């Protein structure tokens, strides 16, 4: 039996994570003799606690061990299992990532301007979760921009060292409908 692929492991892990209200965000495997690694990134609408991650890690380890014993998985001579949350440098590639980071600053590129990085605060998602409100401050004035998620690339949460203004945070917490009614066209 070959070393398991990330897709195979994701299929095994999905029900375990879903039972706890979590999503499998990423699975990476590295086969390196006695130093093989399985790295699993999980997240949820409520950030998982370290206790929950520890419990999940133990359960995953037991599942992998049982499947190795049954001959359905083969990690080779041994492996290191790492279970954690994605971290701030994880790309925002699904609507749930945008929803979970509402109010945070994001660096992103528009599909038609791939070489240009823009920065905005993440607002609400549309009801169908296909568009997001992006908030910028221009001369102390709030500007709403509505973008379809499919038109955004290289989106990553920006680390902030200063507290954003109350006005900007309040704008980020407005409903999508409010943001859409008050949005500027891109030519503004």
UniProtKB/Swiss-Prot annotation:
Origin: domain of life: Bacteria
Gene3D superfamilies: RimP-like superfamily, N-terminal (3.30.300.70)
Single GO biological process annotation from the record: ribosomal small subunit assembly
Function, in words: Required for maturation of 30S ribosomal subunits.
Family annotation (InterPro entries): Ribosome_maturation_RimP, RimP_N, RimP_N_sf
Name of protein: Ribosome maturation factor RimP
Subcellular location: Cytoplasm
Family: Belongs to the RimP family.
Gene Ontology cellular-component terms listed: cytosol
Keyword annotations of the record: Cytoplasm, Ribosome biogenesis
One Pfam family matching this protein: RimP_N
Keyword Cytoplasm (UniProt): yes
